[in-house]
Amino acid sequence: MAQSTLYSRVLGTGSYLPPDRVTNQQLTDRLAKEGIETSDEWIVARTGIHARHFAAPDVTTSDLALEASRRAIEAAGVDPQSIDLIIVATSTPDFVFPSTACLLQNKLGIKNGGAAFDVQAVCSGFAYAMATADSFIRSGQHRTALIVGAETFSRILDFKDRTTCVLFGDGAGAVILSASEEPGVLGSALHADGSYSNILCTPGNVNRGVIDGSVFLHMDGQAVFKLAVNVLEKVAIEALAKANLAPEQIDWLIPHQANIRIMTSTCRKLGLPQERMVVTVDQHGNTSAASIPLALDAAVRDGRIQRGQHVLIEGVGGGFTWGASVFRF
């Protein structure tokens, strides 16, 4: 008897934003006390961001991941003990090691000895994690994966640099991906170019347990913008080709929620109407690896994304890294 082809498909989604919502005006007032000038109008015009969420000092990335994971598990209707693969995409882990994924596995009470590890591709992290989990499931090594993007970027922001501190926020999003004979993930593409590592980085490093250098995020905004708009269209087309789909067959585009100008540029280049693009950056800012699953969960829960529809996710981030995946929800 011929063995059936194995696919992976999305069973459920979840997300979590910490309760401390900081509006542009609140952030502007905070910065003004430090002698730094900005305004709600300046931030919105350049980024489309109106607010972001910051985690409390005693809340870690794994805590945010836990809340999002619980919601995804509930939505998927799976037994947590059936999850035999956990991948957390993050650039702000709780510790140097162990991985945030291992900490999350323990917090969820999963005792089955399944694999758990982190992926670090900054804002492309969720695209990398989803493609990785899909490959593991298709190979037959694992059956049910929990994929999480979670960040506490507020911990690495320099609040004396108005060009970066207004952009980022904290949050987490999660997806349950499970083995299926029915096609789900249809195509993925991942890329990196380390020669651009200096345009978006946190240059501090761990040396014998002590952080040397700056622990704050540094970004060349113009260079990032130029590179992002160039690679995002290409990687989207590549993923679509692997899925045997044309851009017009995509029901929903979920780009990394970084900057509304980058997002709309990519949407326009793909020939998609703006109404098919999911936008949540206005409400939570750039949450790095968490942004794509946050937006995905929002659109699933408000009824925009329906079963059977084609979804294209794409991200670009420090490294420089970029990636995209196409799936049938």
Swiss-Prot record:
Compartmental location: Cytoplasm
InterPro entries listed in its UniProt record: ACP_syn_III_C, ACP_syn_III_N, FabH, Thiolase-like
EC number: 2.3.1.180
UniProt record, GO biological process: fatty acid biosynthetic process; secondary metabolite biosynthetic process
The name this protein goes by in its record: Beta-ketoacyl-[acyl-carrier-protein] synthase III
Catalytic activity: malonyl-[ACP] + acetyl-CoA + H(+) = 3-oxobutanoyl-[ACP] + CO2 + CoA
CDD domains in the cross-refs: KAS_III
Entry comment, domain topic: The last Arg residue of the ACP-binding site is essential for the weak association between ACP/AcpP and FabH.
Organism: Burkholderia orbicola (strain AU 1054)
Family note: Belongs to the thiolase-like superfamily. FabH family.
HAMAP family: FabH
Single GO MF descriptor: beta-ketoacyl-acyl-carrier-protein synthase III activity
Pfam family name, one: ACP_syn_III
Cleavable signal peptide: none
Region annotation (ACP-binding) ranges: 257-261
Enzyme class (EC, first level): transferase
PANTHER family: 3-OXOACYL-[ACYL-CARRIER-PROTEIN] SYNTHASE 3, BETA-KETOACYL-[ACYL-CARRIER-PROTEIN] SYNTHASE III
Single GO cellular component term: cytoplasm
Function of the protein: Catalyzes the condensation reaction of fatty acid synthesis by the addition to an acyl acceptor of two carbons from malonyl-ACP. Catalyzes the first condensation reaction which initiates fatty acid synthesis and may therefore play a role in governing the total rate of fatty acid production. Possesses both acetoacetyl-ACP synthase and acetyl transacylase activities. Its substrate specificity determines the biosynthesis of branched-chain and/or straight-chain of fatty acids.
Disulfide bonds: none
